[in-house]
């Protein structure tokens, strides 16, 4: 199993291109199941989770062509089966996103209960209740969710909690339903908007994406199209923190400041200089000048939970004490014990972490527990004194494209070690 070795202390400087967003790519790959025509997605990130989703589509019967320019063309004319098996779903929770498209187009689906990051229960009951309201019959047998339906019917669905994948699943299902579907308390994340843009390019009738109320008028068929996946705001935010904690100067290209308004505001409050351009963000920071800032994770447009662990690293070396309140997922402080091994002063009380800045972290052997936690440990290694050896880095490959190569290009002393 691969490990990553980081020797800290280098100041990172330079320009880095941002990859396509994993959290937009995965639902958009699933959306190709909705049509018999070919859909081409561009700016597809080369990630383990994307490979898993392509394998899942392939076993459903999709014909997949990949070009040399990060483009993927998917032809789902012939869906051979509607089962998402345990061996694929267990590795990636986003596999559940094929559920809505399969039920909408084929009238049935069998989905293994999902896996992915171990950051709380993240139940799919909100997805299932919505499908039931649209006329589907749902049963749970032998670890599989079995769903059967005729043509789905439009419904008024109010989410008890804001759910990104739940919004995406029901948004996709509703595009082929009979009648009008209203999703209230829907997720407003940029990735949901990007999915809606793809679906509308395929012929769907959608209004309100990016707000808390989305209205979908079902159509009988969707058609093929081409679509550019939006840039990854979480990768962007991660490299922004890398600039801050190393006292560096990094420009991220191919990304949009509007995707990260809450994160940019907090980094400015913490003492970073940030230049916003049309398709780029530049972050500069002086060593020893970072200030403590309180953070509460919230649904978009609030501070994203997927950048909580990275900002915690910044706060470990900032002046003063700060509070991080995690309101989205339970068990999302599993990186704290590893940061403490590196000398961080962090106390966890329920869903709140109190972070008191220290002059410097120290390198240590640490273990990644989930995707974003693994990124935080790399960031900690970059600003720590000495060597940090990070185990179980397969987590990071699920969401970051060639992270060690990109960091090395900016001046980091980092390398991947084989078994």
From Swiss-Prot:
The active site is at 117 (proton donor). One of its GO terms (cellular component) is cytoplasm. GO terms for molecular function: UDP-N-acetylglucosamine 1-carboxyvinyltransferase activity. Pfam families: EPSP_synthase. Its main location: cytoplasm. GO terms for biological process: cell division; cell wall organization; peptidoglycan biosynthetic process; regulation of cell shape; UDP-N-acetylgalactosamine biosynthetic process. The modification 2-(S-cysteinyl)pyruvic acid O-phosphothioketal is found at residue 117. InterPro entries: Enolpyruvate_Tfrase_dom (IPR001986), Enolpyruvate_Tfrase_sf (IPR036968), MurA_subfamily (IPR050068), RNA3'P_cycl/enolpyr_Trfase_a/b (IPR013792), UDP_GlcNAc_COvinyl_MurA (IPR005750). It comes from the Bacteria. Pathway: Cell wall biogenesis; peptidoglycan biosynthesis. CDD domains: UdpNAET. UDP-N-acetyl-alpha-D-glucosamine binds at residues 93, 306, 328. Keywords: Cell cycle, Cell division, Cell shape, Cell wall biogenesis/degradation, Cytoplasm, Peptidoglycan synthesis, Pyruvate, Transferase. It catalyses: phosphoenolpyruvate + UDP-N-acetyl-alpha-D-glucosamine = UDP-N-acetyl-3-O-(1-carboxyvinyl)-alpha-D-glucosamine + phosphate. Phosphoenolpyruvate binds at residues 22-23. Its EC number is 2.5.1.7. It is found in: Cytoplasm. HAMAP family: MurA. Belongs to the EPSP synthase family. MurA subfamily. Cell wall formation. Adds enolpyruvyl to UDP-N-acetylglucosamine. This is UDP-N-acetylglucosamine 1-carboxyvinyltransferase. It comes from Magnetococcus marinus (strain ATCC BAA-1437 / JCM 17883 / MC-1).
């Amino acid at each position: 199993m691969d490990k990553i070795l980081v020797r800290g202390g280098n100041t990172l400087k330079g320009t880095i291109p941002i990859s396509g967003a994993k959290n937009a790519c995965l639902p958009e790959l699933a959306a190709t199941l909705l049509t018999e025509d070919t859909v081409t997605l561009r700016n597809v990130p080369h990630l383990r989770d994307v490979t898993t989703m392509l394998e899942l589509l392939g076993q459903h019967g999709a014909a997949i062509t990949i070009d040399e320019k990060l483009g993927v063309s998917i032809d789902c004319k012939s869906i051979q089966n509607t089962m998402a098996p345990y061996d694929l779903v267990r590795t990636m929770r986003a596999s559940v996103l094929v559920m809505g498209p399969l039920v909408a187009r084929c009238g049935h689906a069998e989905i293994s209960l999902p896996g992915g990051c171990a950051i709380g229960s993240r139940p799919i009951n909100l997805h299932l209740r919505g499908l039931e309201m649209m006329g589907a019959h749902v049963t749970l047998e032998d670890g599989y969710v079995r769903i059967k339906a005729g043509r789905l019917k439009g419904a008024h669905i109010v989410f008890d909690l804001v759910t990104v994948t739940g919004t995406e699943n029901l948004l996709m299902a509703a595009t082929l339903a009979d009648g009008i579907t209203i999703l209230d308390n829907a997720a407003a994340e940029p990735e949901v908007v990007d999915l809606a843009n793809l679906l509308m390019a395929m012929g769907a009738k959608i209004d309100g994406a990016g707000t808390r109320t989305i209205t979908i008028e079902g159509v009988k068929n969707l058609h093929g199209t081409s679509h550019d996946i939006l840039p990854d705001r979480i990768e962007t935010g991660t490299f922004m923190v890398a600039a801050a904690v190393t006292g560096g100067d990094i420009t991220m290209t191919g990304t949009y400041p509007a995707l990260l308004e809450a994160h940019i505001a907090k980094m400015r409050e913490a003492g970073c200089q940030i230049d916003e351009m049309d398709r780029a963000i530049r972050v500069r920071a002086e060593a020893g000048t970072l200030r403590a800032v309180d953070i509460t994770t919230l649904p978009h447009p609030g501070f994203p939970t997927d950048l909580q662990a990275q900002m915690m690293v910044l706060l470990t070396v900032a002046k003063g004490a700060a509070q991080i309140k995690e309101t989205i997922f339970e068990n999302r402080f599993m990186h704290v014990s590893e940061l403490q091994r590196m000398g961080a002063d962090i106390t966890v009380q329920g869903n709140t972490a109190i972070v008191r800045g220290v002059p410097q972290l120290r390198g240590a052997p640490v273990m990644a527990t989930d995707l974003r936690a693994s990124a935080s440990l790399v960031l900690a290694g970059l600003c720590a004194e000495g060597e940090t050896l990070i185990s179980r880095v397969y987590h990071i490959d699920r969401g970051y494209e060639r992270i060690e190569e990109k960091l090395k290009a900016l001046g980091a002393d980092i390398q991947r070690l084989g078994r």
